[in-house]
C-alpha cells in the first residue's frame, strides 16, 4: 500500500509495487514524483528523512539532510525566512534517494534501476500535470511576495498569470535536471555538470552556498530513537530532528489511562495539549549531535517523563508563551507484501522554500537555514558545516519486530502535535486510518498565518468541549474544519492477519492505494 499527498505520486508508487518492486523502490518513485507535483511543499532543493524497517527486525533511519555553508554571512539579526540569506543549507533529498536504492538492493533484493524509478517524475515535469487546488492556495497566499523571488514567476506562473485549477502545468527546466540525475546518478546533483549549474545559479541569486558545499553533502544511515508505548515500540529519527519531542509527548501520555478518557472530549484534548507543552520545554536543546551532546537517555527516561506527567493539572492549562515556526512538507509511506516498510518526509521547510528558483535548473531551493538561531548561547546557533534543527519526524510503530503503523504529517512545529493525536487514535482508540485522520485536530502556538499564541481548534470540535477547554484556561482560537493548518497527514496500519488499511488526509489532495491482488 502507498499513501501520499498527491494521487499521481501514489499511483507511481503503486505501479512499482504491481511490477514486483519493493517498498523502498516504490517510495523513491513516490518521492521523485512529489517533488514535481507538490512544488509548494517539497523539491529536489530540499531534504528527506526515511524510517526503514522490515519483519526481520532490521530498522534504520536515512537522514538526507543538508549542512550550513562553509562561508556564512555575518548574521546580526535573525536569519530571514526568504531570499538568498535563507539559502545557507545544502539539500540532501536526492542523495537520500540513491542511498535508499542501494539499501534496497543490499537488504531487500531490489531489482529496479535507479533511473527507471525517476521516469514518472520526469514525465510529469516534461509533459505537465493538472495543477491542484493546494498549489493554487499557497500561490495565492504568497501573491504579494513572489515578485521579489528570483525566477519564481517564470517557473510557476509561466504565462504571466495565475494558473487555473486543473490546467496543465509543466516544468521543463526541472525535467532536464531530473534527466541528468537519472542518467548520471544522484551525485550528478552534487558533483557533476548539474552541480556546477546549481552552484552558478545559487551564486547569481546571492546565496553563500558553493560547489564545495554541494560536494560535501551526503546522507547518513543511522539508528532510530525508540520508546515503549503500552507494549509497542515507537520509532523516531534522532537529533537534529524533533523526533525526540514526539516520543516524549507519547511517553508523557503513557502515564495516563486513556481507556477512561473519551476520544475527542475536553479531557482528551487537554491531556494532549499539556503533554505537548511539557515535551516542548526540552525541545530548544535539540541540535546537531555531531557538535552538541544530546542526552537522549535523560530526555526519554521514564522518571523524567513521569514527573512531567505529574506536573500536568487536569483542571488547568499551563501558561504557554512559546515561539513556534511553521512549514510545509510532504509525508508518504509504503509497505509491501514482503513486510518491508518505509515512512518518509520530504521538505523545503516553508511553503515555496526560500522562494528562489536556482538559475535555469528549475530547482526551488529550501530555506532550512532559517531554522538556525543566531544566539551564541543556543545549541542550535548557526555554524559552518552544521546541520540545523529539523522539524521533520516521520513515525513508525513496531509490534514485536514487525512494522505495525506508519504515519507522519506536514506542519513543522505542529508535526509532533498531530502525530500525538494520530498515534493515540490509532493505538489507544483503535480507529481506522481514515477515521483517525478525519476527526478534529488542534494546533498550539503561533503560525505564519496567525500570530496569536493560542490553542487553535478546528471548528468541528463541539461547542461544549470548546467551552470546557476555555474554562481550564486555554486561549482558544477557531480555525476551519479540516484546516491545512492542522497538518496534512497519512497513515498505514498493518494488521496481524495481513489486512492493510491506509488513508491520506482529507485536508489535502492525496490518497492511499494498494494493489488488489
Residue ranges and their predicted role:
Residues 1-11, 15, 21-185, 189-191, ...:
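Noncatalytic scaffold domains of N-terminal-nucleophile
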Residues 255-348, 360-361, 368:
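Internal maturation/activation junctions in enzymes
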Residues 338, 386, 419, 428-484:
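Extended C-terminal subregions enriched in glycine
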Residues 235-243, 329-333, 343-357, 408-416:
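Glycine-rich phosphate/pyrophosphate-binding beta-alpha loops
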Residues 42, 47-54, 330-334, 394-396, ...:
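Short beta-strand scaffold segments in enzyme catalytic cores
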Residues 24, 36-53, 58-60, 208-210, ...:
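Active-site rim segments in enzyme catalytic domains, especially the processed small/beta chain
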Residues 221, 326-329, 390-392:
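Short, small/polar residue-rich loop motifs at catalytic or cofactor-binding pockets
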Residues 147, 243-259, 397-400, 404-405, ...:
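M16/insulysin-pitrilysin zinc metalloprotease superfamily fold
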Amino acid at each position: 500500500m502507498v499513501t501520499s499527498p498527491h494521487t499521481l505520486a501514489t499511483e507511481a508508487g503503486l505501479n512499482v509495487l504491481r511490477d514486483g518492486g519493493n517498498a523502498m523502490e516504490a517510495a523513491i518513485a513516490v518521492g521523485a514524483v512529489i517533488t514535481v507535483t507538490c512544488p509548494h511543499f517539497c523539491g529536489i532543493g530540499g531534504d528527506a528523512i526515511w524510517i526503514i524497517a522490515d519483519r526481520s527486525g532490521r530498522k534504520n533511519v536515512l537522514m538526507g539532510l543538508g549542512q550550513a555553508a562553509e562561508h556564512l554571512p555575518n548574521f546580526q539579526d535573525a536569519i530571514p525566512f526568504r531570499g538568498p540569506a535563507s539559502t545557507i543549507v545544502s539539500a540532501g533529498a536526492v542523495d537520500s534517494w540513491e542511498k535508499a536504492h542501494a539499501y534496497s538492493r543490499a537488504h531487500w533484493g531490489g531489482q529496479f534501476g535507479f533511473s527507471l524509478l525517476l521516469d514518472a517524475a520526469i514525465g510529469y515535469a516534461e509533459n505537465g500535470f493538472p495543477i491542484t487546488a493546494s498549489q493554487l492556495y499557497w500561490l495565492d497566499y504568497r501573491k504579494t511576495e513572489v515578485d521579489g523571488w528570483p525566477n519564481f514567476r517564470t517557473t510557476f506562473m509561466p504565462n504571466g498569470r495565475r494558473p487555473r485549477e486543473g490546467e496543465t502545468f509543466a516544468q521543463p527546466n526541472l525535467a532536464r535536471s531530473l534527466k541528468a540525475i537519472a542518467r548520471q546518478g544522484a551525485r550528478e546533483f552534487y558533483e557533476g555538470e548539474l552541480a556546477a549549474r546549481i552552484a552558478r545559479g545559487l551564486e547569481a541569486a546571492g546565496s553563500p552556498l558553493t560547489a564545495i558545499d554541494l560536494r560535501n553533502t551526503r546522507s547518513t544511515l543511522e539508528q532510530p530513537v525508540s520508546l515503549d508505548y503500552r507494549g509497542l515500540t515507537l520509532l523516531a529519527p534522532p537529533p537534529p530532528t524533533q523526533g525526540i519531542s514526539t516520543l516524549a509527548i507519547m511517553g508523557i501520555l503513557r502515564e495516563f489511562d486513556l481507556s477512561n478518557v473519551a476520544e475527542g472530549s475536553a479531557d482528551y484534548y487537554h491531556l494532549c495539549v499539556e503533554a505537548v507543552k511539557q515535551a516542548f520545554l526540552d525541545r530548544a536543546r535539540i541540535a546537531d549531535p555531531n557538535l552538541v551532546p544530546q542526552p537522549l537517555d535523560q530526555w526519554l527516561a521514564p522518571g523524567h517523563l513521569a514527573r512531567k506527567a505529574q506536573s500536568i493539572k487536569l483542571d488547568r492549562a499551563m501558561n504557554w508563551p512559546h515561539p513556534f515556526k511553521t512549514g510545509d512538507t510532504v509525508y508518504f509511506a509504503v509497505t509491501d507484501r514482503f513486510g518491508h516498510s518505509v515512512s518518509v518526509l520530504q521538505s523545503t521547510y516553508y511553503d515555496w522554500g526560500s522562494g528562489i528558483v536556482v538559475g535555469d535548473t528549475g530547482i526551488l531551493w529550501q530555506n532550512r537555514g532559517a531554522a538556525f538561531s543566531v544566539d551564541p548561547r543556543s545549541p542550535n546557533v548557526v555554524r559552518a558545516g552544521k546541520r540545523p534543527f529539523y522539524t521533520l519526524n516521520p513515525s513508525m510503530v513496531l509490534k514485536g519486530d514487525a512494522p505495525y503503523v506508519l504515519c507522519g504529517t506536514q506542519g513543522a512545529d505542529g508535526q509532533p502535535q498531530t502525530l500525538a493525536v494520530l498515534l493515540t487514535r490509532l493505538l489507544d482508540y483503535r480507529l481506522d486510518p481514515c477515521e483517525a485522520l478525519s476527526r478534529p485536530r488542534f494546533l498550539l502556538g503561533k503560525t505564519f498565518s496567525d500570530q496569536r499564541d493560542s490553542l487553535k481548534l478546528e471548528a468541528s470540535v463541539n461547542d461544549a468541549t470548546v467551552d470546557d477547554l476555555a474554562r481550564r484556561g486555554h486561549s482558544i482560537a477557531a480555525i476551519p474544519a479540516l484546516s491545512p493548518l492542522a497538518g496534512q497527514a497519512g497513515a498505514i496500519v498493518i494488521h496481524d492477519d495481513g489486512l492493510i488499511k491506509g488513508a491520506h488526509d482529507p485536508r489535502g489532495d492525496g490518497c492511499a492505494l494498494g494493489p488488489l491482488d
